[in-house]
């Protein structure tokens, strides 16, 4: 894989925009199904639908022509989602100030928020374990280089790649290699809230 053409923090920003675009896509699907729009459900539904569609397309090599446009569209949807979300949230920041002061006074809440913040910061770091480097990054890099699925004998555990690796391929295609890690940490934090 080629050297990054920009600072690694830009890759983290791209990953956050792709995740935001996935949330917006999931919210639109939920709206069409007349369901309540939850951030966690929208993120999960958007990730599964996008990844499953790309996984099916990858079996016939169609995915490799639509991968980059899909990643760019998700990034632009994420920028739109964040822009519209910030227009709603910023005026409410003054009312949140009192709630934040109450949370700071309770040590259990303060400790849990500190742990969540640390977990998010940890997800921004590069992966170091063999499973992430060999398998979760290896399959997306192999897909992008060879435009086909690797044989199962190439990987540490002989596992077949799934929709998680397809979603990581979206991130790796735009140099947002921490997309899967940030998705996992946000999901754990949203489940705990």
Language model features with spans:
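Basic, ligand-binding patches in group-transfer machinery
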Residues: 102
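Short, flexible segments with low predicted structural confidence
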Residues: 1-2, 111-112, 138-139
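Membrane-embedded, hydrophobic transmembrane alpha-helices
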Residues: 1-99
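Cytoplasmic-side transmembrane-helix entry/capping segments in multi-pass membrane proteins
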Residues: 41, 105-108
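Active-site lumenal/periplasmic loops and adjacent helix-entry segments of GT-C-fold
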Residues: 117-193
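Transmembrane signal-anchor helices characteristic of membrane glycosylation enzymes that use polyprenol
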Residues: 77-83, 107-130
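Membrane-embedded helix bundles of polyisoprenyl
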Residues: 43-51, 111-115, 183-193
């Amino acid at each position: 894989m080629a050297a990054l053409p920009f600072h690694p923090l830009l890759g983290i920003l791209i990953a956050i925009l792709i995740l935001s675009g996935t949330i917006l896509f999931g919210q639109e699907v939920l709206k069409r199904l007349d369901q309540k729009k939850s951030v966690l459900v929208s993120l999960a539904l958007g990730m599964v639908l996008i990844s499953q569609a790309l996984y099916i397309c990858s079996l016939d090599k169609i995915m490799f022509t639509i991968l980059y446009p899909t990643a760019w569209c998700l990034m632009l949807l994420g920028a739109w989602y964040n822009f519209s979300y910030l227009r709603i949230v910023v005026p409410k920041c003054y009312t949140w100030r009192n709630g934040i002061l109450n949370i700071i006074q309770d040590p259990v809440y303060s400790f849990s928020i500190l742990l969540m913040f640390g977990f998010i910061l940890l997800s921004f770091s590069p992966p170091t374990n063999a499973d992430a480097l060999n398998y979760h990054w290896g399959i997306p890099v192999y897909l992008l280089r060879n435009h086909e699925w690797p044989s199962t004998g190439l990987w540490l555990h002989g596992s077949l790649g799934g929709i998680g690796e397809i979603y990581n391929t979206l991130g790796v295609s735009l140099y947002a290699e921490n997309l899967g890690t940030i998705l996992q940490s946000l999901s754990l934090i949203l489940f705990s809230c």
